[in-house]
């Protein structure tokens, strides 16, 4: 399938990890925006084949992934730490464990202009930068050389990211010095939203509220953890907005799977064979799985997928509340373990509309922010698709 010497024909299957750009010895690979996401563009290729060797899509086989060894529902025992976490605080516990061993942690943060990127932390207080879910594809390109450098220096490295990002880092570091020091924690993912759309979203609300956004929350828990996916934003002028149609419009674009990367619809990293040593995500269905466990401030499902994962989990025993749960039970209530998001029939139409009309008009047309207009436009598009099928 991938018979060309470089990664230019991976196309829609590309997950945007940037490994190819990093590894190219002649800088022939550039990442360019297409449809709201970064894709590789290859020029003046010298046919060395290095990009193919470290591409997580080309090198993805179930044999290279781990079977789930143990499955749990869990949360961190410290209530205050749990309240500050999006889910059960498991990432904080793992990251703290690594920092205590003089290791380093890589995870997603909000950078300059609210751009989501990966960051290197080697101090316990820096772990707070990673708090909060960020439903935007994070840029990992700047940390790839740092990860390799840390491994070469004998550091214990924890990398946290989506399954495709974890697969990318493992592909890149495989065979490098001290590879056994790399520990990976994958965050369960149901498709990565566009950084371009999020940038437009931030610019729009800054314009409307005449102030710079200082923080953005995709999972505001002021009304409890179960009230999930409520957005909020804080501005430098002190304004705090919460759960309005403008903010929730962005959520609707994601929920409708318009604002999801093309490769996510055929995700190669889903299922019981996992990329990471540990897998963490929200545990939905907790009232049916374990109604006696207190999930008021969040609870996580945790999959332990390797001997490294088992070792770390055992070290956290005194810090966590947990219960062993059969994997099939978790799958029953957490579809992200089983299937990828479904591609909308008008997915390409959405991106053409966005490219032509911009974010605000797209939001009005494709989300509740548009009110009655939204409903009418959706109905018209549905009629058009029906007529096309009949013709």
Description of each model-found segment:
Residues 101-104, 206, 211-391:
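Long, compositionally biased charged/polar accessory segments in the mid-to-C-terminal portions
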Residues 9-13, 19-41, 50-67, 277-278:
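Iron-sulfur cluster-binding cysteine motifs and their immediate structural context
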Residues 134-158, 163-184:
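Conserved nucleotide-cofactor-binding alpha/beta core module
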Residues 180-204:
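Short, flexible loop segments at boundaries between secondary-structure elements
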Residues 1-4, 8-11, 40-43, 246-255:
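Short, intrinsically disordered, charge-biased short linear motifs at domain edges
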Residues 87-89, 112, 159-169, 191-193:
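Gly/Ser/Thr-rich loops at beta-strand to alpha-helix junctions
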Residues 12-26, 46-58, 162-168, 260-272:
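Local cysteine-cluster metal-coordination motifs and their immediate loop/turn environment
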Residues 1-4, 47-153, 328-365:
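Flanking helices and flexible, charged tails adjoining ferredoxin-like Fe-S electron-transfer domains
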């Amino acid at each position: 399938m991938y018979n060309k010497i470089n990664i230019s024909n991976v196309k829609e299957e590309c997950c945007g990890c940037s490994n190819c750009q990093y590894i190219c010895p002649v800088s022939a690979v550039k990442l360019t925006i297409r449809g709201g996401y970064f894709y590789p563009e290859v020029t003046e290729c010298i046919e060395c084949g290095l990009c193919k060797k470290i591409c997580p899509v080309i090198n993805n086989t179930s044999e290279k992934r781990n079977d789930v060894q143990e499955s749990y529902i869990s949360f961190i025992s410290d209530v205050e730490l749990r309240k500050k976490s999006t889910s059960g605080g498991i990432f904080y516990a793992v990251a703290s464990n690594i920092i205590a061993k003089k290791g380093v942690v890589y995870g997603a943060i909000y950078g300059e202009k609210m751009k989501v990127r990966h960051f290197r932390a080697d101090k316990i207080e820096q772990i707070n930068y990673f708090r909060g879910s960020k439903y935007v594809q994070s840029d990992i390109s700047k940390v790839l050389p740092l990860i390799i450098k840390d491994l070469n220096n004998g550091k214990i490295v924890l990398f946290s990211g989506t399954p495709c990002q974890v697969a990318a880092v493992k592909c890149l570091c495989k065979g490098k010095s001290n590879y056994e020091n790399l520990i990976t924690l994958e965050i369960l993912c149901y498709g990565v939203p566009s950084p371009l759309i999020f940038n437009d979203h931030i610019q729009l609300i800054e314009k409307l509220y005449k102030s710079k956004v200082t923080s953005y929350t995709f999972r505001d828990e002021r009304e409890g953890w179960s009230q999930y996916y409520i957005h909020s934003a804080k501005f430098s002028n002190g304004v705090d907005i919460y759960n309005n149609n403008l903010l929730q419009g962005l959520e609707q674009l994601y929920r409708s799977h318009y604002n999801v990367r093309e490769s996510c619809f055929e995700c190669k990293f889903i299922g019981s064979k996992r990329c990471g040593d540990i897998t963490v995500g929200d545990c939905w269905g907790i009232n049916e799985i374990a109604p006696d466990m207190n999930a008021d401030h969040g609870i996580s499902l945790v999959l332990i997928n390797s001997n490294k994962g088992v070792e770390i989990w055992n070290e956290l025993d005194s810090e966590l509340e947990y219960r062993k749960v059969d994997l099939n039970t978790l799958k029953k209530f957490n579809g992200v373990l089983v299937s990828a998001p479904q591609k909308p029939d008008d997915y390409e139409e959405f991106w053409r509309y966005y490219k032509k009309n911009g974010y605000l008009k797209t939001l009005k047309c494709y989300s509740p922010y548009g009110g009655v207009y939204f409903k009418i436009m959706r109905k018209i598009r549905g009629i058009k698709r029906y007529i096309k099928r009949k013709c």
